[in-house]
Amino acid sequence: MSQDIHAHRILILDFGSQYTQLIARRVREIGVYCEIHPFDMSNEAIIAFAPRGIILAGGPESVHEADSPRAPQAVFDLKVPLFGICYGMQTMAEQMGGKVQGSDLREFGYARVDVVGKARLLDGIEDHVDDDGVLGLDVWMSHGDKVTEMPAGFHILASTPSCPIAAMADDARAYYGVQFHPEVTHTKQGLRILSRFVLDICGCAALWTPSNIVDDAIATVRAQVGSSKVLLGLSGGVDSSVVAALLHKAIGDQLTCVFVDNGLLRLHEGDQVMAMFAENMGVKVIRANAEDKFLGRLAGVADPEEKRKIIGRTFIEVFDEEATKLQDVKFLAQGTIYPDVIESAGAKTGKAHVIKSHHNVGGLPEDMQFELVEPLRELFKDEVRKIGLELGLPYDMVYRHPFPGPGLGVRILGEVKKEYADLLRQADHIFIEELRAFDWYHKTSQAFVVFQPVKSVGVVGDGRRYAWVVALRAVETIDFMTARWAHLPYELLEKVSNRIINEIAGISRVTYDVSSKPPATIEWE
């Protein structure tokens, strides 16, 4: 490697905001490596991390609470540029000698801030200029407390009628604070503001690019693996597909993939995976046809959590059987991505709440003595997709909708039967086919069909049909934490419904799910 793409790095300290990962994604989008760490990161770890700049993210707490989080002292001792966002601005102000008070008027949502001072952070960045020459920015606010007195050395940079110190600056030390959220798209100039801080003020070079990431990952894998053999569980999903392409480019025939066909995949999915990787790319792929084993274990089981656990355990068992047939495999590759790493760290603090168990929780048997290779563990999902394109994977594969690990097992409500899976596969295929035909597939974030174990009367020709009911589900979302049901055109819904009922004899009725998240989850189980 000619350059270290991690050398110019930003540290983001997390105080519990729902937007913290969004800040990191924006910084990466700018082309600079960054990491998220908890606000109580040790002073030694901060110094060892050697950031070019530090961002103090937002959070739900009030600085007035006795045990509210504080920034570590090393943040100030390092004397690198500092950017406090929302709560990050408030704790920064108070820790440096300023004052923060609760506000009678809380601000949530759109606001316009007037840029009333000068500083490098906002110089030349505005949305409006009023008749008096005052510059304005359209921003997204979400706060109750506000800074009422700035620490020594700071001046007011921006204000609103209810928040006179909406932004503050100390150019001499390159310390800045904003009460709004530059990381959300509602703040129109947010990316420019973050770019100004990261590139201009911190002096970072934009080294974090897809081609550089691929080169770096290949070099890292080769250094870790040497001439040893690597095993990968290939699912056909985006993450494992990108890992397969990346490892194949890095180590060629040292990689063997195991594709477990559990009988709960989408229509023709197994054949498509084999065609893409084994035939087109020349990757060594073992296909384990385990439909009977999976469906046998699931017989009579209706509880969603139990179904997930059975599917997870059976996958591990089948994978283990195939792995033991291979000789001299030293490494196991996984498609772990950065949000998994962050969530795992969060779970260790005891603050995480399990809504649904992940299908691979529990991992592989302890007697499988593999070392892990996780080439995507530094990457967000959007970065993984860009890497996939960089590696030559087809756009439609890289930008395919998410598919749950347990597959159709959690899209068939109640007991899973082969009959139900076959009907659901056909219905789902029709729905996706028509979404593409109407140019709605990439306008939705996730779309699928759910099989409901209830029958309904229908009329076909002169005959009466008593058959199964399915529900269509399509949502739009940025982060999958919240989602809105997709307002699909009636013509599209009508076409899908007519095709499903006319082409699939076992289905008599089609419904459309108009529930958003929250309160509903995206998947039904």
UniProtKB/Swiss-Prot annotation:
Domain GMPS ATP-PPase: 208-400
Alphabetical UniProt keywords: ATP-binding, Glutamine amidotransferase, GMP biosynthesis, Ligase, Nucleotide-binding, Purine biosynthesis
SUPFAM superfamilies registered for this protein in UniProt: Adenine nucleotide alpha hydrolases-like (SSF52402), Class I glutamine amidotransferase-like (SSF52317), GMP synthetase C-terminal dimerisation domain (SSF54810)
Catalysis performed (reactions): XMP + L-glutamine + ATP + H2O = GMP + L-glutamate + AMP + diphosphate + 2 H(+)
Listed GO MF terms: ATP binding; GMP synthase activity
Top-level lineage group: Bacteria
One of the GO biological process terms: GMP biosynthetic process
Catalytic residues, chain numbering: 86 (nucleophile), 181, 183
Pathway(s) this gene product operates in, as recorded in its UniProt entry: Purine metabolism; GMP biosynthesis; GMP from XMP (L-Gln route): step 1/1
InterPro entries recorded: Class_I_gatase-like (IPR029062), GATASE (IPR017926), GMP_synth_C (IPR001674), GMP_synth_GATase (IPR004739), GMP_synthase (IPR022955), GMPS_ATP_PPase_dom (IPR025777), NAD/GMP_synthase (IPR022310), Rossmann-like_a/b/a_fold (IPR014729)
EC number: 6.3.5.2
Signal peptide (from-to): none
Domain Glutamine amidotransferase type-1 intervals: 9-207
Cellular component, GO annotation: cytosol
Residues reported in the UniProt entry to bind ATP: 235-241
Oligomeric form and interacting partners: Homodimer.
Function: Catalyzes the synthesis of GMP from XMP.
PANTHER family for this protein: GMP SYNTHASE [GLUTAMINE-HYDROLYZING], GMP SYNTHASE-RELATED
HAMAP family per record: GMP_synthase
Official protein name in the record: GMP synthase [glutamine-hydrolyzing]
Organism expressing this protein natively: Pseudomonas aeruginosa (strain ATCC 15692 / DSM 22644 / CIP 104116 / JCM 14847 / LMG 12228 / 1C / PRS 101 / PAO1)
